[in-house]
């Protein structure tokens, strides 16, 4: 490595990506159900109670779609386009009995998460026996495999954290992807594999910790009434994500679902959304 290359590496290593706090504004919420009008209204009331934190300093317009207003995906998308909500709230398996088999989110939710740019809050199906009460957002987990620079995820997770609640920011590096990368590095004679492993792993985790530190400082400076906990780790994505959700007794999991390069749900988001069924999910 030349001296110029060394200088460039040192300069890049010293450069840190800061978090920029940008308060999430939600002008309207659309609650979508497949229930009759009266039951739909009751469900909407429960959702509004669960999301009471959103009423903080805002005058939000709440609308409800009941089961008699749509019977196809295009009809539902038309209703959403007409309403133009800032947030969609619904549950798994609309107009379907497949909620009894936990292998999908149902075609309506699948399409909503990809065909609209609006964040979707997915709640457990009303007929599914509840493993826990869904009453508030005192404990929110915002989780990804690459937290650095993901201001939107942090801002949305912070917006949904109740006053005096806890926000857990979790960065889980995929250990299998890392090992595949190191396997390739090990085949390059000019690179010390052991040194590369230590340096790369350390850099990945340090960058995430630095970014989260800037999140803590920015949210505190903004005066948000919440406590932030940082988790930076490696592991097998699905099992590690579930462990963090369970250990923290999360009320809400916030994660990214959209990928510019594909039509399907982003990365691990779909299997995780299918697996984590007992708590609401905010899918960005």
Regions found by a protein language model. Name each.
Residues 116, 212-229:
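A structural motif corresponding to the C-terminal end of an alpha-helix
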Residues 77-132, 242-284:
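Gly/Ser-rich helix-loop-strand patches that form or flank binding pockets
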Residues 72-76, 153, 157, 241:
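Generic hydrophobic alpha-helical segments
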Residues 1-68, 138-198, 220-224, 284:
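Small/aliphatic-rich secondary-structure junction motif
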Residues 211-218, 234-246:
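A short, acidic, amphipathic alpha-helical segment used as a generic capping/interface helix at domain edges
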Residues 65-75, 232-238:
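Charged docking surfaces used in two-component/phosphorelay signaling
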Residues 40-48, 106, 205-213:
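Short, surface-exposed alpha-helical segments at coil->helix boundaries
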Residues 192-210:
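A short acidic, glycine-rich active-site loop
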């Amino acid at each position: 490595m030349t001296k110029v290359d060394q200088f460039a590496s040192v300069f890049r290593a010293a450069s840190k990506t800061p978090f920029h706090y940008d308060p999430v504004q939600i002008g309207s919420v659309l609650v979508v159900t497949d229930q009759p009008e009266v039951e739909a209204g009751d469900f909407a009331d429960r959702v509004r109670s669960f999301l009471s934190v959103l009423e903080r300093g805002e005058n939000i317009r709440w609308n409800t779609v009941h089961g008699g207003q749509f019977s196809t995906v295009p009809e539902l998308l038309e209703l959403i386009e007409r309403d133009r909500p800032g947030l969609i709230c619904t549950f798994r398996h609309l107009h379907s009995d497949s909620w009894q088999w936990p292998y999908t989110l149902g075609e309506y939710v699948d399409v909503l998460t990809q065909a609209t740019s609006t964040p979707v809050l997915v709640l457990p199906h009303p007929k599914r026996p509840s493993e826990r009460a869904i009453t508030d957002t005192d404990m929110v987990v915002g989780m990804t495999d690459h937290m650095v620079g993901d201001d939107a995820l942090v801002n949305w997770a912070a917006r949904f954290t109740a006053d005096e609640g806890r926000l857990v920011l979790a960065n889980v590096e995929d250990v299998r992807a890392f090992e595949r990368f190191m396997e390739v590095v090990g085949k390059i004679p000019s690179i010390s594999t052991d040194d590369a492993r230590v340096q790369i792993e350390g850099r990945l985790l340090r960058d995430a910790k630095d970014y989260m530190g800037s999140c803590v400082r920015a949210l505190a400076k903004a005066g948000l009434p919440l406590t932030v906990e940082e988790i930076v780790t490696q592991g097998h994505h699905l099992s590690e994500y579930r462990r963090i959700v369970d250990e923290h007794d999360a009320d809400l999991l916030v994660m990214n679902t959209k990928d510019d390069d594909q039509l399907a749900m982003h990365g691990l988001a779909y299997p995780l959304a299918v697996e984590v069924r007992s708590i609401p999910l905010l899918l960005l």
